[in-house]
């Protein structure tokens, strides 16, 4: 199941948390461009919206995640280093991403076949492990980062509840 291009909220689900329980931490761009993507405990009616768009040039289930901007400035996108393990996800525009060697495409796939709205956001893949977007405490604030998860059966993969904003 793929996404239609559009505005979405992106809420982190802690391990064992069902998606239908309200609250939680929503991915945020409040710190601005060239900073790590953080999270805030705001509800689905907040102004934290992301434009998720297909990026078929990069392959199946590949997307870009772009911040919503009300001004005329160039928006930032979720960007990840292609060779760093465990690093933060930054909010870079395409020019900055290319200068730093970061990648702005993400594989977003359903976490379960029978549960709507719950997804895994995959970054880098290498022999033995895959990096997944997750949330951690860094410098006193929640930060989106790349969590390496070994490729073995029954390992928990971080999940996100992604819902369309009308």
Curated annotation (Swiss-Prot):
Similarity comment: family membership: Belongs to the protease inhibitor I85 family.
Stretches for region Disordered: 20-39
This protein's UniProt keywords: Protease inhibitor, Thiol protease inhibitor
CDD domains in UniProt: beta-trefoil_Ricin_Macrocypin (cd23716)
Gene3D superfamilies: 2.80.10.50
Organism the protein comes from: Macrolepiota procera (Parasol mushroom)
Name listed for the protein in its UniProt record: Macrocypin-5a
Known role: Inhibits papain and cysteine cathepsin endopeptidases, and also inhibits cathepsins B and H, which exhibit both exopeptidase and endopeptidase activities.
GO molecular function: cysteine-type endopeptidase inhibitor activity
């Amino acid at each position: 199941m793929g996404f239609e291009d559009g505005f979405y909220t992106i809420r982190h689900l802690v391990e064992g948390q069902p998606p239908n329980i309200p609250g939680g931490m929503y991915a945020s761009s409040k710190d601005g461009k060239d900073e790590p993507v953080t999270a805030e405990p705001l509800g689905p009616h907040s102004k934290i919206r992301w434009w998720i768009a297909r990026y078929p040039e990069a392959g199946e289930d590949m997307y870009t995640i772009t911040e919503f901007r009300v001004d005329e400035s160039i928006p930032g996108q979720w960007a990840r280093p292609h060779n760093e393990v465990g690093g933060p996800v930054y909010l870079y525009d395409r020019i900055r991403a290319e200068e730093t060697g970061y990648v702005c495409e993400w594989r977003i796939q359903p976490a379960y076949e029978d549960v709507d709205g719950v997804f895994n956001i995959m970054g880098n893949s290498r022999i033995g492990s895959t990096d997944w977007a997750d949330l951690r405490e860094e410098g006193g604030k929640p930060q989106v980062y790349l969590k390496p998860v070994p490729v073995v059966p029954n390992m928990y993969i971080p999940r996100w509840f992604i819902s369309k904003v009308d």
